[in-house]
């Protein structure tokens, strides 16, 4: 039988490995000479490879214990596991899949005991974990968020019987996350959010609930954040596509005006008032015609930049809303004015730069799951993309703010671009006809005159092919243990996520590359299953990126797959063995039959890799440091 000491020892090791893994990752962003940085990268990979099996054993043993051997567990065993579940929850460890699985396995035991206060924690824990996952997964996990948080709220009227003060907080944590996050994350309807907001506003007036404000100082703060969150949704309705009814909108107008007067009276200055209150108030005044949109923009612009200088004084501040939502609101308000185009453009560039700088460094202030959601909402929102004058500016913005937000993905994408460019050069020399498809609508002679454009396209496609991974960074950042089956299913979503990201008219030409780079040449294997790469007009470049993607991943001796590295020669043998099924046979033969190309590719993956990685790191690290200073 597993002892309690065994469980404690396993959890402590797991936490230690997790923290050390994060620490080594963070060291990669610190300034260092090339040799030192490469050593850090190798140390990080070695460590993660060494602890992966150990941590995987902990997860497997725990799952076995709580499922197949649960009849051997005593109450003390369950309480010990619960203790570490709490530690995982409060550590903000970005391990929601593990946390959700653990909470769901513990819940039946405490439900049998009718242990209200431990159940409150576990429901809240499961609600939190599933709400975080809902930011990157649009599946059934969204329903779990609402289900578990509503379970917490169902204990609301028992609040004065709780022995542990923290249990009271859970009630209002549930309200806050349902109202503030649920609607935007897609797991709560606007009508449900409105009903809960009214309910919360009502119970705040009841003595039964207000009596705990002193013993539980988080309660009034959580209530205010929840209600402000609903008001923010009204403020952001045009950006989010929310359809507020007249009753909802009037509720928000009345409450916002009241909030502004109260906050203005209490605050040290106008610039110390909560940003959400200020933005909502002046938006209402402009919509009513009490002030012009030009006046509203002038007031809010002044407030925004002076407020930013005061952020260090704020406690529990919502950076994502301030830097992303409000920057986008300022742009949308500008579009309602009759200001000269040059003045609008200057301001838009200023807001956009502030937003980009924040997103480039927001891992310092945001959970990774929150970062993913914010990154997608801001970077790919039509309001932002329409502010660029040409596709090149737009593409550079995407690469700089999204692709470079995750160093391993960025280095891999750059490596793929180098490999693709090298192969494509030989394609134009020896077999350019393979680039022509029935939908190309050009002759071979016409194609040959477009070599620079085709090469530029392939390089950009390589840089953007894995952009969907930036929507699941928390999953691909998990290196201290194997991915769970659920996490792997999320990972396999990255081609579709990439295609969703690239739906803008200037990116649509890269969409099939993102969708198809994990499909086999014959279209019979790979994912997504329903994408037909064989008949895509972009098939030649899909085939090219697929081969380059596999070459780099298999030969990468510096990054995360350190313990699975293969020699270049071995990879070439695998390409030859699977040409015609997994890989384009013409491209494989091209590599194998031309020694100069073979040597160039081998040079890139074996000798040039360190230089390429370090160059990417310097760009990434310098941007990171600059944005740290700015923020």
Task: Name each model feature, range by range.
Residues 7, 11-29, 46, 349-361, ...:
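Intrinsically disordered, glycine/charged-rich C-terminal tails and inter-domain linkers
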Residues 12-49, 70-90, 115-136, 164-187, ...:
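Amphipathic alpha-helical repeat scaffolds of TPR domains
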Residues 361-489:
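Acidic/His-rich, divalent-metal-binding segments that scaffold phosphate/diphosphate chemistry
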Residues 168-169, 436-462, 502-547, 561-565, ...:
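Histidine/acidic-rich helix-loop-helix segments that form or flank divalent-metal centers
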Residues 63-75, 105-119, 151-168, 202-219, ...:
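Flexible helix-coil transition and linker loops at the boundaries of alpha-helical arrays
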Residues 8-17, 46-64, 89-108, 135-158, ...:
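Helix-turn-helix repeat elements of alpha-solenoid scaffolds
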Residues 415-425, 487-503, 566-583:
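An active-site-proximal "capping" alpha-helix that borders the catalytic cofactor pocket
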Residues 267-269, 289-290, 295-368:
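Extended, non-transmembrane interaction/recognition domains
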């Amino acid at each position: 039988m597993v002892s309690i000491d065994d469980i404690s020892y396993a959890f402590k090791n797991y936490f230690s490995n997790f923290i050390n893994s994060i620490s080594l990752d963070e060291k990669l962003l610190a300034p260092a000479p090339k040799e030192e940085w490469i050593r850090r990268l190798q140390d990080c990979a070695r460590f993660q490879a060494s602890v992966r099996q150990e941590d995987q054993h902990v997860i497997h043993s725990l799952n076995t214990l709580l499922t197949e051997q649960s009849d051997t567990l005593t109450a003390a065993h369950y309480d010990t596991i619960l203790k570490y579940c709490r530690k995982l929850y409060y550590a903000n460890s970005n391990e929601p899949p593990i946390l959700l699985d653990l909470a769901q396995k513990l819940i039946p035991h405490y439900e049998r005991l009718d242990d209200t206060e431990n159940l409150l924690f576990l429901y809240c824990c499961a609600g939190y974990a599933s709400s975080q996952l809902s930011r990157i997964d649009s599946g059934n996990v969204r329903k779990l968020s609402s289900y578990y948080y509503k379970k917490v709220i169902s204990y609301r009227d028992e609040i004065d019987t709780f022995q542990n003060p923290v249990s009271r907080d859970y009630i209002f944590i549930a309200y806050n996350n349902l109202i503030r996050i649920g609607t935007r994350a897609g797991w709560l309807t606007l009508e449900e959010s409105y009903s809960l907001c009214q309910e919360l506003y009502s119970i705040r007036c009841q003595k039964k609930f207000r009596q705990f404000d002193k013993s539980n100082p988080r309660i009034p703060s959580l209530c205010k954040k929840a209600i402000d969150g609903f008001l923010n949704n009204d403020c952001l309705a045009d950006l989010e596509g929310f359809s507020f009814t007249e009753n909802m909108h009037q509720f928000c107008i009345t409450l916002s005006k009241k909030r502004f007067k109260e906050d203005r009276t209490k605050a040290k200055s106008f610039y110390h008032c909560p940003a959400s209150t200020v933005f909502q108030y002046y938006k209402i005044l402009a919509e009513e015609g009490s002030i012009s949109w030009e006046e509203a923009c002038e007031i809010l612009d002044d407030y925004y930049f002076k407020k930013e200088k005061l952020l260090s004084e704020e406690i529990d501040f919502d950076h994502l809303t301030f830097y992303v939502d409000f920057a986008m609101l300022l742009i949308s308000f500008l579009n309602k004015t009759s200001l000269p185009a040059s003045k609008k453009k200057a301001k838009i560039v200023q807001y956009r730069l502030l937003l980009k700088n924040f997103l480039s460094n927001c891992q310092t202030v945001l959970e990774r799951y929150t970062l993913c959601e914010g990154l997608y909402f801001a970077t790919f929102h039509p309001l932002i993309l329409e502010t660029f004058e040409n596709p090149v500016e737009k593409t550079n913005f995407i690469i700089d703010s999204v692709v470079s937000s995750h160093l391993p993905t960025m280095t891999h994408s750059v490596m793929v671009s180098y490999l693709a460019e090298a192969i494509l050069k030989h394609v134009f020399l020896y077999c350019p006809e393979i680039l022509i498809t029935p939908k190309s609508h050009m002759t071979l002679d016409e194609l040959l005159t477009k070599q620079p454009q085709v090469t530029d396209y392939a390089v950009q496609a390589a840089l953007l092919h894995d952009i969907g991974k930036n929507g699941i960074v928390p999953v691909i950042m998990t290196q201290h243990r194997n991915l769970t089956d659920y996490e792997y299913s999320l990972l396999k979503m990255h081609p579709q996520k990439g295609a969703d990201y690239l739906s803008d008219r200037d990116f649509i030409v890269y969409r099939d590359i993102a969708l198809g780079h994990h499909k086999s040449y014959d279209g019979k294997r790979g994912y997504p299953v329903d994408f037909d790469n064989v008949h895509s007009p972009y098939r030649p470049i899909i085939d090219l990126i697929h081969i380059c993607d596999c070459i780099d991943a298999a030969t990468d001796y510096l990054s995360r797959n350190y313990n699975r590295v293969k020699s270049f020669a071995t990879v070439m043998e695998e390409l030859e063995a699977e040409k015609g099924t997994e890989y384009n046979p013409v491209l494989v033969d091209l590599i194998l039959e031309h020694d100069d190309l073979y040597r160039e590719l081998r040079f890139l993956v074996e000798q040039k890799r360190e230089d390429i990685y370090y160059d990417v790191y310097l760009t990434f690290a310098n941007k990171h440091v600059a944005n740290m200073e700015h923020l």
